[in-house]
UniProtKB/Swiss-Prot annotation:
ATP binds at residues 157-218. It comes from Cryptococcus neoformans var. grubii serotype A (strain H99 / ATCC 208821 / CBS 10515 / FGSC 9487). This is Bifunctional purine biosynthetic protein ADE5,7. Its cofactor is Mg(2+); Mn(2+). The gene is ADE57. It catalyses: 2-formamido-N(1)-(5-O-phospho-beta-D-ribosyl)acetamidine + ATP = 5-amino-1-(5-phospho-beta-D-ribosyl)imidazole + ADP + phosphate + H(+); 5-phospho-beta-D-ribosylamine + glycine + ATP = N(1)-(5-phospho-beta-D-ribosyl)glycinamide + ADP + phosphate + H(+).
Length: 802
């Protein structure tokens, strides 16, 4: 009986060529050797550690390192029937090793020479990110002939953070990034890179980018050009000394997974960066196949790309190889990438953590001795020693580089993995060995105490004591807001209000809720928290007063990841101040401490207000008619709307929140923008109770165009004519128009433009209304009239702001 046709079986005796001589290559050889499909691994040139592995692994002493020399290694690979090439370092990838092997039909786990420019040119990679809307630091690139232009750019104060980072665009052995503290240091850094050529040709182009702050993570991800699969995020330690002090190195240790890389953070890294990167490279015509190693800064606004690398990281790889479980075949994963079928592969990881600690030569990262003999005693179970700068000499392993070894361990907890790695180091010695004793200190410093008697709410990140401290801190200011009908103490299960004591005969309750929007981002970035509480109250109570309602009481909602009592007290003190201005009682609220829901020191606010109005005084009245007069009450500034656009304009103007405001030399940008929303209650209530007003509009997001028509019913044909020449546009709005190139039409449908409240009155009551407002501390003016035409008609729009 003839055999049924079947697909050929995958090759089960693979020969793999590993290019490189470091700890990364030793770790890759270690994991590849576990594959049942791999028969032989040749490491070229390898090191003392790969020389001692035996079994499937051997070294090859064949020179390569520049395109002409690829010929000899390619010819050798052809003769030896190599099935897969895995370059370790970035230089051969940028130099075109993938293309050299591709010509003879040998697949390479690594990007094409063009795709490798993601690492080979920082200027190119930044332009790529900008083109594909991938979040990264603001930047500008310069050629080496534009030194004076680069200096002038820094002098122009282009970044909100006030600091810059100088990067040599080309490959500089991991040393081409300079982080000056001051402008003077930045100028010196530019000179060293662009004029003095400290990094040689790597400095032919320079990137000047904004300094970002926050924790860093490294995400290594496999890609086949379509699918991208990240490994757990790692954190490395670049500085030579404990506490991240001293000179920068290639890396003194790493650990994974990094606790800071929460599920939410990783999802954003994938959705906002990794997937758009792979899609963008494919769209640009350079599909990325290989290892995409992305450095992220976790900022208050989310993950931002620091840099791309196009190969396995060192020393992250050493730790990550220990995390891969026994069922994960690394050779199969690499082949799936080059064969464009990564979506068919599943990577598995051990439960727990892995750590790598680098042992370096004395003097590293400067000059250091070589050829020193080493003592390598047996290490505890669970410890792996990956060689980097070593070689075999007369059957003795000696030092042969700056970073000599990476001692690695995995364990169920990070603390156990760290302790196990350091116990392994105790079995190793060579003259002048240098290593950091604080690897993973960032994560360990936030660990709960060892062997707790039992889990507590505080151990989960919620401090009941902090909540109690906050209640005690705010009790005096809350008590000051009491009014007839509201006498309960804060800290209970809610608030009660006795409506009978408020003195109303035929009351209608009116409620409103609101937040502060992205004005909160300004408060957080500026570090000023005592005014946004006023905004929170104002936004809700001003919505009550336009219905004729007097605010009775207010409740707030304050949410954060970790309660900072002084900050929360500032916010709630502001809320109490807003309540005092509105004449309402702060009778309760909720402070929600929710670890993992918010990032860092971020918090969010919401408010809820309840007011009352006599049935006969509900606004708007049904008798609004054409010819009625519109009165305008000034705003105190942007109030709490339009801040997404305002922040964008400020950013594009290269202003920081601490800079002097261009529209007011007596204050800073941040202080000016945080001027609290005006509370209109007390000036308006007397006129409401006297029956002077027919309707009102609180000018919030949507400006005049969207808010004023809300006074009229949908069945009405009424609208308004607004005379913009009746007042002078305040300086802040003129600056925003000019700096953002915002058209007048956009201004009046986005911002309040200096008018926070519009009142409709009968023409014969206009003078009485103006007098009532003035007597109660509010200057107003006639800004227009009601007409038989829907919408808002503007007079003077063409000259608005000039």
């Amino acid at each position: 009986m003839p055999e049924i046709t079947a697909f050929p079986q995958p090759k089960s005796d693979l020969s793999i060529l590993l290019l490189g001589a470091g700890g990364r290559e030793h770790a890759l050889a270690f994991k590849l050797a576990q594959s049942s499909r791999v028969a032989r691994i040749v490491v070229c040139p390898g090191n003392g550690g790969t020389a001692l592995m035996g079994g499937k692994v051997s070294n090859l002493a064949l020179p390569w390192g520049a395109p002409p020399a690829f010929r000899s290694i390619v010819e050798w690979a052809q003769k030896e029937n190599i099935d897969l090439v895995v370059p370790g370092p970035e230089q051969p990838l940028v130099d075109g090793v993938e293309g050299a092997f591709k010509k003879v039909g040998i697949p390479v786990f690594g990007p094409s020479p063009a795709a490798a420019m993601l690492e080979g040119s920082k200027s190119l990679s930044k332009e790529f990110m900008a083109r594909h809307n991938i979040p990264t630091a603001a930047f500008r690139s310069f050629t080496s002939t534009q030194y004076e232009d680069a200096v002038a750019y820094i002098k122009s104060k282009p970044f909100t953070s006030g600091r810059s980072v100088i990067k040599a665009s080309g490959l500089a052995a991991g040393k081409g990034v300079l982080i000056p503290e001051t402008d003077e240091e930045a100028f010196a850094a530019l000179k060293s890179v662009m004029v003095d050529k400290e990094f040689g040709d790597a400095g032919d182009e320079v990137v000047v980018e904004e300094y970002l702050s926050g924790p860093e993570i490294s995400v290594l991800a496999f890609s086949d050009g379509y699918t991208i699969v990240p490994m757990p995020a790692a954190q490395d330690h670049k500085r030579i000394g404990e506490g991240d002090t001293g000179l920068n190195t290639g890396g003194m240790g790493a650990y994974a997974p990094a606790p800071i890389a929460t599920k939410e953070i990783m999802e954003r890294c994938v959705k906002d960066v990794l997937e758009p990167t792979i899609k963008g490279m494919r769209e640009d015509g350079y599909p990325f196949v290989g290892m995409l190693f992305t450095g992220f800064m976790i900022t208050a606004d989310g993950p931002r790309v620091l840099e791309y690398n196009v190969r396995f990281g060192d020393p992250e790889t050493q730790a990550l190889m220990l995390l891969l479980d026994e069922q994960t075949d690394l050779a199969e994963v690499l082949l799936a990438c080059v064969e464009r079928r990564l979506d068919s592969i599943k990577l598995g990881y051990k439960q727990g953590y892995a750590v790598s600690v680098v042992l370096a030569s004395e003097g590293y990262p400067g000059s250091y001795p070589k050829g020193l003999p080493m003592t390598l005693n047996p290490t505890p179970e669970g410890v792996e020693v990956f060689h980097a700068g070593t070689k075999r000499s007369d059957n003795v392993t000696v030092t042969d580089g700056g970073r000599v070894l990476a001692v690695c361990a995995s364990a169920p907890t990070l603390r156990a993995a760290v302790d196990l790695a350091y116990s392994g180091i105790s079995q190793i010695s060579f003259q002048g060995q240098t290593f950091r004793r604080d690897i993973a200190y960032r994560a360990l410093s936030s660990e709960p105490p060892a062997e707790p008697k039992g889990l507590t709410y505080a151990a989960a990140g919620v401090s009941v004591d902090a909540g109690n401290d906050l209640v005690e801190a705010i009790k005096p200011v809350v008590k000051a807001t009491r009014r007839p009908g509201a006498d309960s103490d804060i800290g209970g299960f809610g608030g009660a209000f006795d409506l009978a004591k408020a003195g109303y005969k035929d009351p209608i309750l009116v409620s409103g809720t609101d937040g502060v929007g992205t004005k909160l981002r300004v408060a957080l970035d500026h570090g000023k928290h005592n005014t946004v509480g006023i905004d929170l109250v104002a936004m809700s109570v001003n919505d009550l007063i336009v219905q004729g309602a007097e605010p009775l009481y207010f409740l707030d909602y304050y949410a954060c990841s970790k309660l900072d009592v002084p900050v929360a007290a500032d916010v709630i003190t502001g809320i109490a101040e807003g309540c005092l201005q509105a004449g309402c009682a702060l009778i309760g609220g909720e402070t929600a401490e929710m670890p993992g829901m918010y990032h860092g020191d971020d918090y969010d606010l919401a408010g809820f207000a309840v007011g009352v109005v006599e049935r006969a005084q509900i606004l708007p009245t049904p008798d609004i008619a054409s010819g009625d007069v519109l009165l305008a009450l000034s705003s105190s500034g942007p109030h709490s709307n339009g801040f997404s656009l305002i922040r964008k304009i400020v950013s594009l103007s290269n202003l920081s929140l601490h800079d002097t405001a261009p529209w007011d030399k007596n204050t800073s940008v941040g202080d000016a923008l945080l001027t609290p929303t005006k509370v209109y209650i007390k000036p308006l209530l007397p006129g409401i109770k006297s029956g002077l007003y027919k309707g009102m509009s609180h000018i919030t997001g949507g400006g005049f165009t969207e808010n004023i028509p809300r006074i009229f019913s949908s069945a009405s044909n009424l609208g308004v004519k607004l005379d913009l020449t009746s007042y002078s546009l305040p300086a802040i709005w003129k600056w925003l128009m000019r700096a953002g190139n915002v058209e007048a039409k956009e201004m009046v449908r986005t911002f309040n433009c200096g008018v926070g409240m519009i009142i409709i009155v009968a023409k014969d009551k206009a003078d009485a209304a103006l007098s009532s407002l003035k007597e109660n501390g509010e200057e107003a003016w006639v800004i227009g009239e009601v007409q038989e035409k829907k919408g808002v008609e503007y007079v003077g729009l063409d000259k608005f702001g000039l």
